Amino acid sequence: MSIIHYFSLHVESARSALKQLLRQPFGTLLTLIMLAVAMTLPLFMYLGIQSGQSVLGKLNESPQITVYMETAAAQSDSDTVRSLLTRDKRLDNIRFIGKEDGLAELQSNLDQNLISMLDGNPLPDVFIVTPDPATTPAQMQAIYRDITKLPMVESASMDTEWVQTLYQINEFIRKILWFLSLTLGMAFVLVAHNTIRLQILSRKEEIEITKLLGAPASFIRRPFLYQAMWQSIFSAAVSLGLCGWLLSAVRPLVDAIFKPYGLNIGWRFFYVGELGLVFGFVIALGVFGAWLATTQHLLCFKAKK
């Protein structure tokens, strides 16, 4: 079989599958709506999270550990601690605030007369350490313990409750997204499978005659796979339209909720690359469901034979 002939077979299968859908507009529309509803919720949640990055960014800020050197620590001691912290791969960022810088900031915020009454500079050198964003609360505690054991470090402070709360929020969002994506993806496959199965049953005699005439399984399966492809494309388009409508509907309500707190939602729709991924993923799910349905029917035919 030449490449041109093989290509023409696929083009003809795609055209016949599209015509088959257009012959039953009402049934096709119901199927598209059913498939679109199955994917609208995870897509809309993704849009909501991406649009709300300005708000979620405040929750995603990594917790920090403030390290206080001893007041008697020399510059060489601070340099040693800085070197040790820099070599620690668990840390994402290290900021040093020298005692002189701290005193200057204190002078700008307090009365000069009060500062002049101080006997020397009572402030220590300070390091503000930001661990890697993926650090768990248990790992944060380990980092905290290791830092307090460094030479000439007097103490360190960390908001352990905020670390735990932040981790739980991020884990909750991540698990909800995975759960919705998995369950609704499975629902989409099952709906596509059932839709193609009904199409196969409606053409059962035609398929069995074709099989008896010696047609290969790929020839029988091909039009149904393309039918699933067209259904996936159209249902994805309907779902994206629903997402756009939902976005415009909830936008004023959400803005009204966050406006008193000075929080602005950066609303957006899918980028071109994201649209390509959505269509590709949905087509893959639909074709997989159709493949399962056709394979099941062909196996049943072999068993009867």
UniProtKB/Swiss-Prot annotation:
Disruption phenotype: Viable. Exhibits morphological abnormalities indicative of defective division sites. While division in wild-type cells occurs along sequential, alternating division planes, the mutant is characterized by the presence of multiple and atypically arranged division sites which frequently divide the cytoplasm into small cellular compartments. In wild-type cells, the replication and segregation of DNA precedes the ingrowth of a septum resulting in two equally sized daughter cells, the process of which is not seen in mutant cells.
Coarse class of the protein's main subcellular location: membrane
Keyword Amino-acid biosynthesis found: no
Keyword annotations: Cell cycle, Cell division, Cell inner membrane, Cell membrane, Membrane, Transmembrane, Transmembrane helix
InterPro entries per UniProt: ABC3_permease_C (IPR003838), FtsX (IPR004513), FtsX_ECD (IPR040690), FtsX_proteobact (IPR047590)
Residue numbers on the Periplasmic membrane side: 50-175, 251-268
Places the protein is found: Cell inner membrane
GO cellular component terms attached to this protein's record: cell division site; Gram-negative-bacterium-type cell wall; plasma membrane
Topology, Cytoplasmic side: 1-28, 197-229, 290-305
Gene Ontology biological process terms, A to Z: cell division; FtsZ-dependent cytokinesis
Transmembrane parts of this sequence: 29-49, 176-196, 230-250, 269-289
Membrane topology label: Multi-pass membrane protein
Subunit and interaction comment: Forms a membrane-associated complex with FtsE.
Record family assignment: Belongs to the ABC-4 integral membrane protein family. FtsX subfamily.
PANTHER family to which the protein is assigned, alphabetical: CELL DIVISION PROTEIN FTSX
Function, in words: Part of the ABC transporter FtsEX involved in cellular division.
Protein name (Swiss-Prot/TrEMBL): Cell division protein FtsX
Organism whose genome encodes this protein: Neisseria gonorrhoeae
